[in-house]
Amino acid sequence: MEMTNAQRLILSNQYKMMTMLDPDNAERYRRLQTIIERGYGLQMRELDREFGELTEEVCRTIINVMEMHHALQVSWTNLKDKQDLDERRLTFLGFDAATEARYLGFVRFMVHVEGRYPHFDAGTHGFNAQTKMWEKYTRMLAVWQSCPRQYHLSAVEIAQIINA
């Protein structure tokens, strides 16, 4: 992240104020203030992640993934014959914090701030799947979107989606 000295000074002052306004996170803000003031390039890359951007298309895809998981859970609940389907495989795991942090942040925003999908279990890791999920979810989405009745899935359709 490239910043002028004036921009670094402004951001440093913002972090200084945040240490006073949010004492619970003061250490984090002091650390960021030091990084900005001293211009540590490697650590300043962390800010790139915090100030990242997700396109509208990516946001819609993530919402579709979450909606697909909702549909899987609804369909499973309505099934009379569950045919050895393991309910745990229908759980929305989230995204990998290490490689898909922006996607994970959007999921947390949707659930905790926007109040969408409150029935999703964040688990002990807060939707951190701890493995890359984007490609898996896009394969699952392709199968789900080809189903004629997306919220009334059969056991076979559910199995096809989760095995995609």
From Swiss-Prot:
InterPro entries: UPF0304_YfbU (IPR005587), YfbU_alpha-helical_sf (IPR023146), YfbU_helix-hairpin_sf (IPR023145). It comes from the Bacteria. Belongs to the UPF0304 family. This is UPF0304 protein ECA3037. It comes from Pectobacterium atrosepticum (strain SCRI 1043 / ATCC BAA-672) (Erwinia carotovora subsp. atroseptica).
